Amino acid sequence: EIQISAIDKHGNQTTKPAKLNITRPERIAAPELGAQPTYVNGIMVVNKKHPLPVNYAPGENLTAGNAVRQIIADMQQAGFDISSSYSGYRSYSYQAQIYQQYVAAHGQAAADTFSAKPGYSEHQAGLAFDIRHGNGALVTNGPAAEWISANAHKYGFIVRYQSGKEHITGYSAEPWHLRYIGGQATAVHESGQTLEEYLGVPGGSY
């Protein structure tokens, strides 16, 4: 409670009590600082059940970065209009900005179907890449998406979020989102499973 005073033009002063209510914006709960990345069979798992530490900031993985640049070069050589630019590593703070923008625009329930909360994004691991057309649009369907689906595993990638698997991965299908896992990519691809199914780890919602 505070006191508010007012003086009129005749010099008369009046003081009245008033209550000041301060509303703080909702804060996103951060993963535990002491948490460590989760590895299963040598593969890092990042999903809505397995967050990364807030201070985990490895930058772009060198091997994965070289592999995504190779797949882009090969697609361009094959005649696809694919941008040399891609969305790769994101820091915790940058992911927080992106997520909050989506929440503000679409609401949290909708945003959670296509955007990760900070600390829960594969991009923070430096192992995930979003492939774009030459005009900057994400590769969502058509021949380019089909080529990626059929060939990404040869470069150590899997298409991480598949159609019909939303209840397992926690996200809508993203044909453009590649996750580098290395030598086991072909086995995952041929199994037709999500990474959660292949490794036998929990997925779904937070």
Ranges and model annotations:
Residues 13-18:
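Extracellular and select intracellular beta-sandwich modules with Ser/Thr-enriched
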Residues 19-206:
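Extracytoplasmic cell-surface/polysaccharide-interacting catalytic and binding patches
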